Amino acid sequence: PREVWLTGALEGRFNTVNQYLSLVYQSDQAFEYLLDYFSQVEEPTLILLFGDHQPQVATNFYTDVLGTAPDTALAQKKQMVPFVLWANYDIPEAQGVELSLNYLSALLMDTANLPMTGYQKYLARLWEAAPVINTVGIRDAGGNWYGENEALPEELEAAVEDYRVLLYNHVCLLYTSPSPRD
């Protein structure tokens, strides 16, 4: 497989970045192959490719590239969920959609025009108030970021607290309910 690596002053200094770049290249080639195949298939097909966050690499890599230490805004940006939603039939097109991983299933079901669970419907509504909720913080509908220890506006705080309770309940039920085989 083809390898990709950093050049210039960064060459040979960040092997994890070189590995990441090579794997991104290989993944891109494989994704192209997959889409080429399914573009020829008659059965309606929807493909979702996503990453849950950008890779963790040495902080000094960012310092060397940016000329300054990474700040909270960069940390939040690294937690964004890059995704591609592709279909071999017409679906609504959108660019620049920013969301966190928790909303992806609701977006997928909505795009596929499939029935959503009550939980997914709730997430679709929450997405409007807080498009990004991750380990670094929360972004509101106005684009304002709040770090994990920052106070939230009252209405957003209530929405996020409701989400935490529902998430806890959802996870607990998932891991405490007997499986259909039991």
Question: What residues fall within each predicted segment?
Answer:
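A short, hydrophobic C-terminal helix/tail in secreted or cell-surface proteins
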Residues: 178-182
